[in-house]
């Protein structure tokens, strides 16, 4: 059995996601606001998936111990650096900004409500993920999506986490927003 994965079996699912009607229904500013108020949660949980990969393949802590494959560590850390501290847009207050914060800035610029996501983040920070997910302000579809993501993370299976990240996010997301 080869270690290579043939992703062609995922093409029908990829086409279904990329062609989802929601992407063709965002035709007005009010619809864009609603979309972003829901989509911001997967933007956040993407970072949790990525940080789980980092903890697995590029663990941090003190004392530091040499472990794992340097090429994989470098690859994961480069993605984390890009996602957590990308070059900010000109004219902003900061020179570097996370993609999540950039998304929230974009939401603010179009008048989308940031209350739900900000309350969610504050609740997760203070009371944990389970309490955050239980908040009634979290859209049900976002809650189900995040639960699915965290089930993968909590499985502790690096190959599942990497597959969710690579095939379920990095490979598919660009096509959704063309």
Stretches with model-predicted labels:
Residues 74, 78-178:
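Active-site-proximal alpha-helical scaffolds that flank and shape metal-associated catalytic sites
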Residues 2-18, 27-65, 78-87, 138-145, ...:
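Alpha-helical bundle segments that constitute or directly flank the non-heme di-iron/ferroxidase center
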